[in-house]
Amino acid sequence: MSGEQYLHWHDGVEFDEATQTWRGYIEDNNVRSNKHLTEQTFDDKGDAIVAASKMLSEARKGRPPA
């Protein structure tokens, strides 16, 4: 995907009850099944937010997650 295709995506975080950790993600606004999670999990929600934001920024620059 080109960076322009990520203009209609958003970032967010989700909490895993089983591990008590957070993960960041980016998701297509129009196709909810099109979602990329951060590889790393985080104990702190703020760290997951930063990771998700960085992932979306990189995708918009033409470097989408694998």
Give names to the regions the model predicted:
Residues 1-23:
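Short N-terminal "domain-start" leader segments
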Residues 53-66:
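Short arginine-rich
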Residues 31-47:
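A short, exposed loop/beta-hairpin motif centered on an aromatic-Gly-Thr core
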Residues 19-21, 25-36:
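Acidic, low-complexity, intrinsically disordered interaction modules
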Residues 2-6, 29, 61:
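Contiguous segments within soluble domain cores/interaction surfaces
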